[in-house]
């Protein structure tokens, strides 16, 4: 498992890489059990970052629709979703080591076979590792809203990243976003409105009801108890 989750200033081809990231590398505490899970199970479930496109048939045991989740947090809901849909393959991306360890622990506990995870910056993974026209669904649940205006440049779901996703989804593939930030929800709608390939699946062209397939996370439960409203956005890729 590689510990460097951000590519250098230039990649191996000498191409200048972006410097503004949608996350901050905090020195969060990784527990002993999380470190143990990484040591035991990374070789089975983890996928190291690389500068060339993945061959999904080489990392998954069975050919199946691929669902990508960006920023899976503890991984508990991702693992449970993978368990609920064994006929699909799941790929998760996370930048925090504690989340990687936690996800590996859950996956090993449930003996999940249809899940692989990457410990790296999602934008670099999308640029370098995800082949075009391969994903049946991309789900991004509760990304950091970066509330302060001067930090909006750090937001993951900007127009440029949303356009990258269109290249990775298959036709009729789904982009599903959930956030508890109303301002971020409307920001996303504004960023995506000019990308003609996306069809908003909301009848009112804004938000949809939470689908049963999206498991309510501990983070979400806490927010609901505090009276926060959850916004689900769902788009389908069209020709």
UniProtKB/Swiss-Prot annotation:
The record's section on Pfam families has: Methyltransf_4
Describe which pathway this protein belongs to, using the record's wording: tRNA modification; N(7)-methylguanine-tRNA biosynthesis
The EC number on file is 2.1.1.33
Q: Is S-adenosyl-L-methionine among the key words of this record? A: yes
Q: Where does substrate bind?
A: 148, 180, 217-220
Q: Which UniProt keywords apply?
A: Methyltransferase, S-adenosyl-L-methionine, Transferase, tRNA processing
Write down the superkingdom of origin: Bacteria
Q: Which PROSITE patterns match?
A: SAM_MT_TRMB (PS51625)
A molecular function annotated in GO for this UniProt entry is: tRNA (guanine(46)-N7)-methyltransferase activity
Q: Which InterPro entries match?
A: SAM-dependent_MTases_sf, tRNA_(Gua-N-7)_MeTrfase_Trmb, tRNA_methyltr_TrmB_bact
Give me the reactions it catalyses: guanosine(46) in tRNA + S-adenosyl-L-methionine = N(7)-methylguanosine(46) in tRNA + S-adenosyl-L-homocysteine
Q: Which residues form the active site?
A: 144
Q: Name one GO cellular component term.
A: tRNA methyltransferase complex
The record's note on quaternary structure and interaction partners says: Monomer.
Give the HAMAP family listed for this entry. Answer: tRNA_methyltr_TrmB
Please state what the protein is called. Answer: tRNA (guanine-N(7)-)-methyltransferase
Q: Which organism was this protein described from?
A: Buchnera aphidicola subsp. Acyrthosiphon pisum (strain APS) (Acyrthosiphon pisum symbiotic bacterium)
Organism classification: Bacteria, Pseudomonadati, Pseudomonadota, Gammaproteobacteria, Enterobacterales
The gene designation is: trmB
